[in-house]
Amino acid sequence: GTATCETQRLANFLAPSSNKLGAIFSPTKMGS
């Protein structure tokens, strides 16, 4: 239904952001 569609869109929107944040913060953690 619409709820599933909304959740899917939200996941698609947040996933790339999480990957970018992970790429930024992971080297910082490993560096320190």
UniProtKB/Swiss-Prot annotation:
Superkingdom field: Eukaryota
Any one Gene Ontology cellular component term annotated for this protein: extracellular region
Subcellular location: Secreted
Pfam families: Calc_CGRP_IAPP
GO BP: amylin receptor signaling pathway
Predominant location category: secreted
Entry annotated with the keyword tRNA-binding: no
This protein's UniProt keywords: Amyloid, Hormone, Secreted
InterPro entries the UniProt entry points to: Calcitonin/adrenomedullin, IAPP
Notes concerning its domains: The mature protein is largely unstructured in the absence of a cognate ligand.
Assembly notes: Can form homodimers. Interacts with IDE and INS. Interaction with INS inhibits homodimerization and fibril formation.
Function: Amylin/IAPP is a glucoregulatory peptide hormone that plays an important role in the regulation of energy homeostasis. Selectively inhibits insulin-stimulated glucose utilization and glycogen deposition in muscle, while not affecting adipocyte glucose metabolism. IAPP function is mediated by the CALCR-RAMPs (AMYRs) receptor complexes. Amylin can also bind CALCR receptor in the absence of RAMPs, although it is more selective for AMYRs.
Descriptive protein name: Islet amyloid polypeptide
Gene behind the chain: IAPP
